[in-house]
Amino acid sequence: NAGRCDPAFPFCGITLPGGAAGRPLPFGRKDNAMQNIRLLDCTLRDGGYINDWNFGFENIRDIVSSLTRAGVDIVEVGFLRNVDYDPDRTRWNTVKELKSILPADRRNVLFSGMALHNFYDIDKLEPWDGTGIDLIRVTFHDYDITEGLEFCRKAQEKGYKISCNPINIMGYSDEGVLWLVEQVNKLHPFAFSIVDTFGSMHQQDLDRIVSLVDNNLAKDISLGLHLHENMAQSFSLAQSFLNKHLVGRDVTVDASLLGMGRTPGNLCIELMADYLNLNFGKQYDIDCMLDAIQDHILPIREKEPWGYSPPYFLSARYNLHRNYAEHFLSKGDLSNRDINHLLSRIAPEKKTAFDASYADELYAAYKDHRINDAAARASLQKKLAGRTVLCLAPGASLSTHKAQIEAYIAAERPLVIAANFIPADFSADYAFFTSGKRFEKLAARPCPVLATSNIAGKADYVLDYNSLAGAFQLGSNSLVMLLHLLADLGVREAALAGADGYGPD
């Protein structure tokens, strides 16, 4: 074990900038120029979603010890919850219970726990005495901010450092973020964290939110960042966050060993520590982290793997609660394409809190509309082969530009398809319907009718609705669906008329 992390050897053998010549800085200690960046490990808390927090008592102690020796600035040891004490799990009923897993030599490491106001009785929280956790990170939704901040206030009065961690900051408007920051300033906690709950953050989102918060949050409140791997961007975003070099602001980045956390996982702390060592003069001991991964985390991942997965990318793409993706995955008969289309149809008011009944309604409707339309497509493909198509939409410009449209038809002799109506002033070769209400109002059918499978009633050609409806804002628009069909059938050129209100984008 000569090459392993040795608790009896707490010093690095390399002198770093800021250290006295020949006297290296001990792990966990930072010189004045380095004090504004902290690395927080959340393996025992966020990683616990993988194994129901059942790490085992000795494993918990060893993970905490390894992270402490590695020089991690903040080690989160689990949740404060209203649960019966189980020494093998990192969910604690009292601070007294968790003291048994903390090392005797704390090495200036801050130890933290996380709490939700409605899952933990604040009256059970003992006053801070310096021998338990130092920091309590409190999460709250946009609908219970007042209750969350009141919990923060009470914990702060008991002597703890507090971090306010609002859930899904991507769901806040700019005005909402500014209002929240104003309330946090009144409380004046130790830290405020930008939490990308659904893993939906892009670079421009990070830039916007960091700018809003940094320019309005009191400068002596540390700013944290908690990311997820839904879109495989957590390491890139964390680097960007640090490279902003926020003036006069302490910052904290959350990460976990091997990125352990609910699929797809979190930012890998070993990667982040290495990046900080190379670029910010830090001296985290990567070996201690790698030992903990090998001894404790890899055996868990063999039983319950995590990592990038398309359904969780899609849940992030639409900024949805992750349980929607898991719910549709559990059906067992949906492709990633199917899940994409289902997630795209979730109403805005249903996105943040998972609604199983609502999800089942979407699933049932989706299944009802799914058909095999290969024969209909093959027949249409033959009829459309080599033809230019004129798509008519029911806009007022059909009347105001009637002469121009007639001239185009006479000159180009296109095959004419009307979208969701039968034109009165033009002769259509086909009518394409995606709306049941429009279809039911047909008094006569002067041309063959193409209808999608969501419509009840007889049509000459029935086409699968789900394969034509796109997973984007106008994906279920009849004209867009018609163009989708034409592209699928190999039509190379189409003209539009009556598409009032549409632009080239």
Where do the model's predicted regions map?
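Short Gly/Ser/Thr- and charged-rich N-terminal loops/segments
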Residues: 17-21, 272
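Metal-ion/cofactor- or nucleotide/acyl-coenzyme-handling active-site neighborhoods
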Residues: 371-505
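Low-complexity/repetitive intrinsically disordered segments
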Residues: 1-2
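Catalytic cores and adjacent flexible loops of soluble metabolic enzymes
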Residues: 34-374
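Extreme N-terminus of proteins, especially the signal/transit-peptide cleavage junction
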Residues: 31-36, 383-386
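Short, Lys/Arg-enriched N-terminal segments with co-localized hydrophobic residues
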Residues: 20-33
